[in-house]
């Protein structure tokens, strides 16, 4: 699948109390192309149930599920994987998941990290944070100019993350982001209908470019 558009990322705090599945389905209905399941807890049984349900939703809507930092779970479900800099070997993940799996890598604001990730077989390169982020307030910043340099340097699609909103996303897309990763500006919503509306608005930004 073409890696372009809205990349929705779950948040266990925002999507507690039964909101996970209806809010995610709303995002998919609104056009999210990739969905990252991000849950850092050690509740393995619950995480497996949720990931299975999310995989089925993604299949229904023609989207792709990406698991954050859990190679074993990604392999078990036959889905993609996102790895941070401390989350294990990308080349080992590629060897296990195979050549067609979507495997993304966090590169922060460093082209050197992206060089290594690209060499190890990353499907996409994620840069950020570009703006103040409530999810990861202490994450190192990345510059908008970095996106332009990365776009000229790498064939892999670029993901922009960190404080992305409908107001600042257009600049990220203009600078070279093929995907915009969104958490709060998508899921911090009053209801599922609002999530769908926000997802459609983010998707329209790509239609306008």
UniProtKB/Swiss-Prot annotation:
The keyword Chaperone does not apply. Pfam families: TMP-TENI. It catalyses: 2-[(2R,5Z)-2-carboxy-4-methylthiazol-5(2H)-ylidene]ethyl phosphate + 4-amino-2-methyl-5-(diphosphooxymethyl)pyrimidine + 2 H(+) = thiamine phosphate + CO2 + diphosphate; 2-(2-carboxy-4-methylthiazol-5-yl)ethyl phosphate + 4-amino-2-methyl-5-(diphosphooxymethyl)pyrimidine + 2 H(+) = thiamine phosphate + CO2 + diphosphate; 4-methyl-5-(2-phosphooxyethyl)-thiazole + 4-amino-2-methyl-5-(diphosphooxymethyl)pyrimidine + H(+) = thiamine phosphate + diphosphate. 4-amino-2-methyl-5-(diphosphooxymethyl)pyrimidine binds at residues 36-40, 68, 106, 136. Its EC number is 2.5.1.3. 2-[(2R,5Z)-2-carboxy-4-methylthiazol-5(2H)-ylidene]ethyl phosphate binds at residues 133-135, 163. Pathway: Cofactor biosynthesis; thiamine diphosphate biosynthesis; thiamine phosphate from 4-amino-2-methyl-5-diphosphomethylpyrimidine and 4-methyl-5-(2-phosphoethyl)-thiazole: step 1/1. It is an enzyme of class 2 (transferase). GO terms for cellular component: cytoplasm. Keywords: Magnesium, Metal-binding, Thiamine biosynthesis, Transferase. Binds 1 Mg(2+) ion per subunit. Condenses 4-methyl-5-(beta-hydroxyethyl)thiazole monophosphate (THZ-P) and 2-methyl-4-amino-5-hydroxymethyl pyrimidine pyrophosphate (HMP-PP) to form thiamine monophosphate (TMP). HAMAP family: TMP_synthase. Belongs to the thiamine-phosphate synthase family. This is Thiamine-phosphate synthase. It comes from Azotobacter vinelandii (strain DJ / ATCC BAA-1303).
């Amino acid at each position: 699948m073409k890696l372009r558009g809205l990349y929705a990322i779950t948040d266990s705090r925002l999507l507690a109390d039964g909101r996970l599945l209806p809010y995610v389905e709303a995002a998919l209905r609104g056009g999210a192309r990739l969905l990252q399941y991000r849950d850092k807890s050690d509740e393995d049984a619950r995480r497996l149930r949720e990931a299975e349900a999310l995989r089925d939703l993604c299949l229904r809507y023609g989207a792709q599920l990406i698991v954050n930092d859990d190679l074993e779970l990604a392999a078990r479900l036959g889905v993609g994987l996102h790895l941070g800099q401390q989350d294990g070997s990308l080349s080992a993940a590629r060897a296990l998941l195979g050549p067609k799996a979507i495997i993304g890598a966090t590169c922060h604001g460093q082209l050197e990290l992206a060089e290594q990730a690209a060499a190890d077989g990353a499907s996409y390169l994620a840069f950020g944070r570009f703006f103040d982020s409530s999810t990861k307030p202490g994450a190192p910043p990345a510059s908008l100019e970095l996106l332009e340099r990365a776009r000229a340097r790498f064939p892999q699609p670029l993901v922009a993350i960190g404080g992305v909103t409908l107001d600042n996303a257009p600049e990220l897309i203009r600078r070279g982001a093929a995907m915009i990763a969104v958490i709060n500006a998508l899921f911090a919503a009053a209801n599922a209908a609002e999530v769908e509306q926000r997802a459609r608005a983010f998707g329209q930004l790509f239609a306008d470019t």
